[in-house]
């Protein structure tokens, strides 16, 4: 008779079903799937060779408790989590198709805790675009957006950094930040504004995909600088999904 498979040790930790992939070394995922935490062969039939895909490095920033991790996990796994340990730094990957382009999203979900503020410079240096998230029922988190934006600009040494302002928890009652306030702030920054619900998935894909489009436009601007003698063309696209 074949030998029975050994039972796992009693003290062996259970795998968290929504545990993120940890940076830095990550295998490439199959289409539309989060990369596995450990090895394994790549699934056949990829829409495009991994080497041919454009990779976009996205960073999610915002105050503690605004739903940064919930937004990211909803995008990656189509699942809402309302209880999880406070994030310090988690990395996720997903292959998607945006406007006909197969691309790989490398998403860094960051902490909003002040004691880790010094770590932000490091991950902001590598990020290409930033989701600046606040909760529509938390005025302080909205006020904190200015601080995050200024830190991003300082670290990137540029006023032209791809960003999207995200008002999360739009499914909840008790709104304290009106849509018009957020739209006005986004307009003053020259960036899009999108309202989301990590619980219902409303606006989640739109927020991340819009950021990818902002990164593409930023790259085009660097390749083809606008005529400095003409009027500026920075515009704000506010999307209330």
Curated annotation (Swiss-Prot):
CDD domains in the cross-refs: H_N_K_Ras_like (cd04138)
Coiled-coil segments: none
Listed GO biological process terms: signal transduction
UniProt-recorded Gene Ontology molecular function terms: G protein activity; GTP binding
Top-level EC class: hydrolase
Subcellular location, principal: host cell
Domain of life: Viruses
Topological type in the membrane: Lipid-anchor
Signal peptide extent: none
Reaction equation(s) it catalyzes: GTP + H2O = GDP + phosphate + H(+)
Assigned keywords, A-Z: GTP-binding, Host cell membrane, Host membrane, Hydrolase, Lipoprotein, Membrane, Methylation, Nucleotide-binding, Oncogene, Palmitate, Prenylation
CC annotations in GO: host cell plasma membrane; membrane
Lipid-attached positions, S-palmitoyl cysteine: 233, 236
Chain positions listed as propeptide in the UniProt record: 239-241
Record entry for activity regulation: Alternates between an inactive form bound to GDP and an active form bound to GTP. Activated by a guanine nucleotide-exchange factor (GEF) and inactivated by a GTPase-activating protein (GAP).
Positions of region (Disordered): 1-41
Cysteine methyl ester modification, residue list: 238
Enzyme Commission (EC) number: 3.6.5.2
Lipidation (S-farnesyl cysteine): 238
Location within or outside the cell: Host cell membrane
Additional record remark: This p21 transforming protein was generated by a transduction of rodent cellular H-ras-1 gene.
NCBIfam families to which the protein is assigned, alphabetical: small_GTP
Family to which this protein belongs: Belongs to the small GTPase superfamily. Ras family.
UniProt protein name: Transforming protein p29
Species this chain originates from: Harvey murine sarcoma virus
Biological classification of the source: Viruses, Riboviria, Pararnavirae, Artverviricota, Revtraviricetes
């Amino acid at each position: 008779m074949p030998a029975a498979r050994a039972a796992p040790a009693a003290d062996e930790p259970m795998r968290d079903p929504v545990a993120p992939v940890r940076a830095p070394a990550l295998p490439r995922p199959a289409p539309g799937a989060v990369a596995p935490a450990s090895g394994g062969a790549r699934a056949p039939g990829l829409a495009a060779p991994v080497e041919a895909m454009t990779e976009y490095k996205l960073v999610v920033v915002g105050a503690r408790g605004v739903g940064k991790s919930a937004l990211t996990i909803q995008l990656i796994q189509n699942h809402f989590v309302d209880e999880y340990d406070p994030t310090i730094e988690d990395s996720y990957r997903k292959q998607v198709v945006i406007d006909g382009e197969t691309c790989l999203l490398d998403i860094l979900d960051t902490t909003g805790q002040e004691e880790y503020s010094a770590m932000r410079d490091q991950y902001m240096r590598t990020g290409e675009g930033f989701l600046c998230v606040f909760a529509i029922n938390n005025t302080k988190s909205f006020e904190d957006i200015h601080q995050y934006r200024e830190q991003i600009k300082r670290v990137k040494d540029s006023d032209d950094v791809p960003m999207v302002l995200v008002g999360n928890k739009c499914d909840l009652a008790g709104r304290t930040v009106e849509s018009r306030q957020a739209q006005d702030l986004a307009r003053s920054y020259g960036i899009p504004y999108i309202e989301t619900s990590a619980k219902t998935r409303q606006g989640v894909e739109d927020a991340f995909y819009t950021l990818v489009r902002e990164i593409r436009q930023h790259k085009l601007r660097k390749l083809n600088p606008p005529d400095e003698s003409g009027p500026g063309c920075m515009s704000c696209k506010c999307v209330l999904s």
